[in-house]
Amino acid sequence: MSEEYAVLSELPVTCSQIDNCAFSFWYEKFKKHVPKSRVIKPLPEQFIQYLEQDGIKLPMSSTELSTYTDDVARTEDNEYSDWEGDEDTATEYEPGIEPLNDFPELHNQIKEIIVELGPVTPKLNWSAPKDATWILPNNTTKCNEVNEIYLLLNASNYIVHDLNHAYDECIDKKEGFSTPEYELVLRQWFAINPALEFRVFVKDGKVAAVSQRDLNYYDYLDKLTDTFKDLIDEFVEDEMVPQFPDKSFVTDLYIPRPFNRVFLIDINPFSRKTDPLLFTWNEIININAQPDRDYELRLITENNIGRFASKEHSQNHVPKDVVDASLDPERIRELSQKWSELLLQQEKESSDEEK
C-alpha cells in the first residue's frame, strides 16, 4: 500500500465502538485497576439542559457554604443588587435552570459522594473537562465541592462534544438515532504525575504503538522504556484484550512509582477522532502489529520550551487573558463576577428591546 493511499484511507468507527468506550461499560470489567469511582446514571433531563444552557448558574443557598457564592449570598449590598432590585428585570428575567430547584436529588447525591470519597474529578460518558481547568483557582479538575463540578462541566467544550457530537463520525448512525443515556462519573481524586501516563494504541489485539501522554520533556523516561513496555504488554494482553469487546482501541494507562502496577485511566475508540499525540494516524494504520514485533514507545526527546509556556487544552478554547487570569485565584474570581454581570446586563437589554 502506498503512503499516498494510506493518508486518504478511512478509519471507520461504529456506534457500538463509541458505546463500548463509555465509562460505565468498561468500569466493572476493570474495576480493580481503576481509581475508585461512582457513576450516577441516568441523569435527569434538567441536568443535561443545565449543561447546555448559556452561562453558568450556581445554586444560591443560605444553608450551603461555597467559595463561589458565599459573598453574594451573605450580603445584600453587592454588585448584583442593582440588577436584582430592578422591578422590570425582576418580572421579565428568566433565571434558567437552577440546581436546587430543578435537580435537587442529583445535587445532594453529588454532595454525598464528595463526603464519601473526598475530592473528586468529574467526567461524562467519555470526556473529562480538562479544557476547563482555567476556571478553578487550583487549575486542575480537582473538585472539593459541588459548585466546582458545575463550573468545570459548564465551561468545557469536551463536555459539549459528549452531549452533541459523540456519534457524528459513526458510519452506521441512522436517521432518528436516539441519544445515549448520559452518566456523570465522579472519580476519587489523586494527583497523577503526567510524565507517567501513556497512550497505548491496540490494533487487532496487539500493542501497535505507545505515546507519551504529556507532551513535555522528562529526561528520566528514556532509561525506563523497557520497564514501561513490559508492564504495558502484560496489562494489555492479560487484562484488556480478553475482556474488551473491540480488538482495536486506544487506552490511557498510568504507571506510578515504584513501577509495579498499572492504572487504567480511559479507553477511546480506534479512530481519527482520538488524538494520536506523538504519532500520526497514517503511521498507526500502516503498522503491522504482530506478536513477535517490537513496537515503539515514543517520547519527547528534547525540551520543548514553547510547550512549557502554555497550559494544556486551554490555549485552543479560551482567550489568552482568561488563561492568564487563571494563574491568579483573585483574578479568576473577579472574572467570574464580571461574567455574571455581563449576562445580567444582556438579559436586561433584551427585556428592554422587547418592550
UniProtKB/Swiss-Prot annotation:
One of its GO terms (molecular function) is magnesium ion binding. Keywords: Cell cycle, Cell division, Cytoplasm. One of its GO terms (cellular component) is cytoplasm. The keyword Membrane does not apply. The keyword Cytoplasm applies. Coiled coil: none annotated. One of its GO terms (biological process) is cell division. Belongs to the CDC123 family. Regulates the cell cycle in a nutrient dependent manner. This is Cell division cycle protein 123.
